[in-house]
Every structure is written in structure tokens, then in C-alpha cells.
């Protein structure tokens, strides 16, 4: 269940806040561990774009979910656009636009 998975994820990655761990489980389910990988700190996840969105998560979305634009990720897939200001949304889009699309492994 979501609560148990959230608790386990937070235990495995103690730098995650309860909100962040829950968001990752709701967004990725058991694949959240793959998204976070070997991270020991939040800094290991790369740039923080706001609302707990990190470079590693965006990289995952580009390579595994074929995200091609910030709006696709922020509004259609996550609704996290509601939690970011305009500058943060533009930064997410610019980061995604720099990444060439890649097939899933």
C-alpha cells in the first residue's frame, strides 16, 4: 500500500521529507527506488527546480517516459506546475529541452 511504500522509501532515503517520499511513490510506485538510485543526499539528485523536482527525476522522465517539454511533465504527468513560479517552470522546460530524447533501456 502507498503508506507502507512511502515509509520504506523515506527510511531508505532519509533525506526525503514525508511529502517528497509520498510524491515519489504516487508518481513512480516501486520505480521510485530506480529514480533515486544510489543517492545519499538531495544534492546527489542534481539541480533542485522547486517542489522537490530534481535533475535526476527529469532525466528519468526524459529517458523512461519520453517527456519532451516542461509542460508535459509539469501539467500532464505531475500537476507540479501548480507549485512552481514562472521562472521555475521555464527552468524545467529549458533543462528538458537540452536533453535529446532517448529510448527506454
Residue ranges and their predicted role:
Residues 1-105:
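C-terminal accessory subdomains/tails of enzymes that are appended
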